[in-house]
Amino acid sequence: RQRQMCMRDSLFHCSGGKDRTGVAAMLILLALGVSDETICQDFVRTNVCRRPELEKIWAAHAEEIEAHPEQKQFYQGIAGVHPESAPFVLNTIRKEYGTTDAYLEAEYGLTPARLMRLRRMYLE
């Protein structure tokens, strides 16, 4: 119980702030019962936050992108995230496990009781 009380506020990040960290954030939001729509919106917010880096990359590779426009999407994946990734992850979880709660229990030991405890701790 004391350990749980100490873990109320948490911060996690990485230098890039996307990909694995983005999926980790998605899983936390899933555990809290957040809607798919909100999870997907949060995931693609990375592109807004990392827009300056993305524009620098596009500028540095402008000639290549002009010659091969598909490269713009490639660089999007380096500096940002592809919007279709979040729904793909959520759909894959449901396809493989039936429900997201079944996935969270099988892979992370988050039983229904633990999920309820997390939701009580972190949601108003």
What name fits each language-model region?
Residues 8-32:
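Catalytic cysteine-centered active loop of the rhodanese-like fold, especially the PTP/DSP P-loop
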